[in-house]
Amino acid sequence: MAPGSRSWGAVLLLAAMLPAACGSCGADGGPLEPFDALYASGVEAYYGGDFAGAARCLEQALRSRRELRAERLRCRRRCRGQVRLAALGAGPAGELPFFGALLRRAGCLRSCEEPRLGAASRHRAAEEVRSDFQRRVPYSYLQRAYIQLNKLEEAANAAHTFFMANPEHMEIQQDIENYKTTAGKVSLIDLEAKPHMEDYSAGVRHYDKEEYGLAITFLERALEGYYAEDEDCQIMCEGPQRFEEHEYLEYKAGLYEAIADHYMQVLACKHDCIRELATRSGRISPIENFLPLHYDYLQFAYYRVGDYVKALECARSYLLFHPDDEDVLENAAYYEGLLEGTVDPATIKPRKEAKALLRRHKLESHLLRVAAVGLGFTYTEPNYWKRYGARQDEHSVPSSISSEPEDGPRLSLTKKPTPKPDRELKEGGPLLYSDVKFVYNSQQLNGTQRVLLDNVISEEQCRELHRVASGIMLAGDGYRGKTSPHTPNERFEGATVLKALKYGYEGRVPLKSARLFYDISEKARRIVESYFMLNSTLYFSYTHLVCRTALSGQQERRNDLSHPIHADNCLLDPEANECWKEPPAYTFRDYSALLYMNADFEGGEFIFTEMDAKTVTASIKPKCGRMVSFSSGGENPHGVKAVTKGQRCAVALWFTLDPLYRELERIQADEVIAMLDQEHVGRSEMNINPKDEL
């Protein structure tokens, strides 16, 4: 089976069209071999069974892509320095100095790049290929090739690198667990890690442990890396752009229209570097408030190590982005008081790089807004510095000052605690809905943090949801196209909430029915949050409507499971009776729930086991409206017995207490619902009858 999730015809076609690259990985010397040609050669070698050749070509493809970017950055920096753009002069010839400098810079770039890269057209990869590299698909091929070559450490790192950008890929996760079983506890390396993001995460970890000196070291290094990456991102935006609204032969732009078209795309790209740098691999949405958070952590960390000058400097840097933040305003005032008599607080300014970035960002925003009005295109400014909810709901964010008379004034850190296995566990809270029936608690299910409920949804809702599922599900959806991700004896089909709403909005399924999926998942979330008596908000991490169907002719003498025994936020090691809470596990998941839609199938029981993955502690037969929920850690290993006849459907829900890991599609679905509600209100106010399905 192909390592990726789509047809590889385009890549293989590219291999056929590039005979010079096939069967080899480029000649020594000469211009840099295009990464798309090397990739095509690697894929061709893989499917031809030449795994050594595949690994060699894929490694060179990845290296070529990195070298291409590095060479373009080097040349663009060099030509920026050598050829300064001239100001416009007065009179009819006033534009000539500017355009003359522009032409000289273009010539500089060509003469700089051509010796190493060759003609620019050699490196214009197809969108599909660029997307593969963005999604790290070459690493999926690489890990398979390494397995065949018995290079298990390299295979594990390639699999881990792919998984970091594809966290829902269950097959790769299983592969990594197999590597751990085979080679013991291995140290996995993300070969495409963003250094500034790694340093930020390390800084936050040390901060959480109150190791403030180490936190400062990593967070300061993260800032250095961030600003360096921002400069690189700005420069890379100066490359070719696509004119999607004018991709037809008749388009003939005038001089200024063509310049404006291109520059607006460059400017929008540069403006969005802030989002790019704040986005983790494989995610669409950035970490909210990412850059300001560095200064927020640092202002308190510096206070705790006694460096009040740096604390005030970082507090004022943070206030550039959020000048009305009362907590940090109080902190800054407190730091000023600590410095009285030693340093004049007025001499301590926000950091220059933060001021410069914010000034540039505001100017970019202004130009984009002006251009949108003048050139007639739509532009909506994202909230790049958005803070999610109240400060106390954010993860590990420094807060305000409190006075404690017995010790004198000092800072009080208010932060949402990171969920730990030894936190106080509660259950038995209200179920919130009168029709929901309690069945079993943790003790009755022979475990910890478990509950079984019935009547969460009605028979009619089950039928309606099943009808929606039939209209929107695709084989392999949610499993990167793998139709049988856990067992070859069953077919898996799935869909997300956002997909359901999209289909409903397009009229492909009744919108009322599509919204039911959204509403019942929210109902389940509220029940779980209430029953387990959580003192902070429970967020969606992933929501998936999934049906698994027994394949006819493949059910005799089955001894496999529909879904192998696993834990949801750690890597289960049955032999060691351990569950390793580390990547690539979904370590941010805290609670899970399965809401069942039907019972007309054979097999498919949900089971809890001991950590040995063998001793069954509870078995649950699905039926319409039944929901099992549990904490996601190693205390609750679970799986699904083989479905031997019929189709088993359920809504699978995973939740997190960390808002940084909220489900991206859920946020988008919330926006769709808000938009639909607003449209509905608008129609009501105009006394217009909405469509039936609304």
Curated annotation (Swiss-Prot):
Keywords carried by this UniProt record: Coiled coil, Dioxygenase, Endoplasmic reticulum, Glycoprotein, Golgi apparatus, Iron, Metal-binding, Oxidoreductase, Repeat, Sarcoplasmic reticulum, Signal, TPR repeat, Vitamin C
Superkingdom of the organism of origin: Eukaryota
Cofactor(s) for this UniProt protein: Fe cation; L-ascorbate
Residues annotated as signal peptide: 1-23
Cysteines paired by S-S bonds: none
Glycosylation site residues: N446, N535
GO molecular function: iron ion binding; L-ascorbic acid binding; procollagen-proline 3-dioxygenase activity
Active site: R648
Primary location recorded for the protein, binned into one broad class: endoplasmic reticulum
Stretches assigned to coiled coil: 386-418
SUPFAM superfamilies in the record: TPR-like
GO biological process, one term: negative regulation of cell population proliferation
This enzyme's EC code(s): 1.14.11.7
Motif (Prevents secretion from ER): 691-694
Role this protein plays: Prolyl 3-hydroxylase that catalyzes the post-translational formation of 3-hydroxyproline on collagens. Contributes to proline 3-hydroxylation of collagen COL4A1 and COL1A1 in tendons, the eye sclera and in the eye lens capsule. Has high activity with the type IV collagen COL4A1, and lower activity with COL1A1. Catalyzes hydroxylation of the first Pro in Gly-Pro-Hyp sequences where Hyp is 4-hydroxyproline. Has no activity on substrates that lack 4-hydroxyproline in the third position.
Name this protein carries in UniProt: Prolyl 3-hydroxylase 2
Name of the gene: P3H2
